[in-house]
Every structure is written in C-alpha cells, then in structure tokens.
Curated annotation (Swiss-Prot):
<dbReference type="Pfam" id="PF17575">
    <property type="entry name" value="DUF5479"/>
</dbReference>
<comment type="function">
    <text>Not required for CRPV to induce papillomas, but may facilitate the functioning of other viral or cellular factors involved in the induction of papillomas.</text>
</comment>
<comment type="similarity">
    <text>Belongs to the papillomaviridae E5 protein family.</text>
</comment>
<dbReference type="InterPro" id="IPR035149">
    <property type="entry name" value="DUF5479"/>
</dbReference>
<protein>
    <recommendedName>
        <fullName>Probable protein E5</fullName>
    </recommendedName>
</protein>
<keyword id="KW-0244">Early protein</keyword>
Length: 101
C-alpha cells in the first residue's frame, strides 16, 4: 500500500549503535528510550533500519517498512502496535541509512 519492497521481519543484527530516540505508543504517550541500529545495502531501495528497546530485548524479530514517497519508517514489534517515524529525522543523524552520497 504505497510502501517500497523494503519489507521484512528479521532478527536483530549485530550492527553499530547509531543514536537514541523517543517514541510514544498508540495507547499511552510516554517516552521510551530506544537505540537505533542499522545495516545498509547500497542497492536501490534495499535499505535496512533496525530498532532495539531495552525492555524488549527478548523479542528477536521486528517488522519494518519504508515509504520513500512520504519519507516515513514504520516499525512493528511482534507484540506491539506499529510506530511511525519520519525519515527526515533519521537522515539528519545517519545519512547513510538512506543511501545519501
């Protein structure tokens, strides 16, 4: 539905620590500290972005989709509602995630 073919449910990789973000769940809007992990493939639309949460380390998989038209990243933990982030925020922190030269 408008999303690119970047869609997968992958185990957490051993990737470099990038930065920390806060997000609000759909049910209650309270800050949770998260750590952005990412892997990058310089191949068209195939970009991988991973997220890790301190209280959810036991969850080995997540689902993510990247909408390149609206520049949004949607992440869904296996037991949580989807979270939507703006790729513009990520681009200012980790340009290589979007394959920016």
């Amino acid at each position: 539905m408008g999303f690119s073919d970047v869609y997968a449910c992958n185990p957490f990789p051993s990737a470099a620590f990038v930065t920390q973000r806060f997000f609000c769940t759909n049910k209650s809007c309270y800050a949770k500290q998260v750590s952005w992990l990412h892997g990058h493939e310089n191949a068209g639309l195939h970009h991988k972005i991973f997220i890790q949460h301190a209280k959810l380390l036991a969850i080995a998989q997540l689902t993510y989709r990247i909408n390149l038209k609206t520049k949004q990243l949607q992440i869904k933990f296996c037991s949580m509602a989807a979270l939507v982030f703006s790729l513009e925020d990520l681009e200012s922190v980790v340009p290589e995630v979007l394959g920016v030269d």
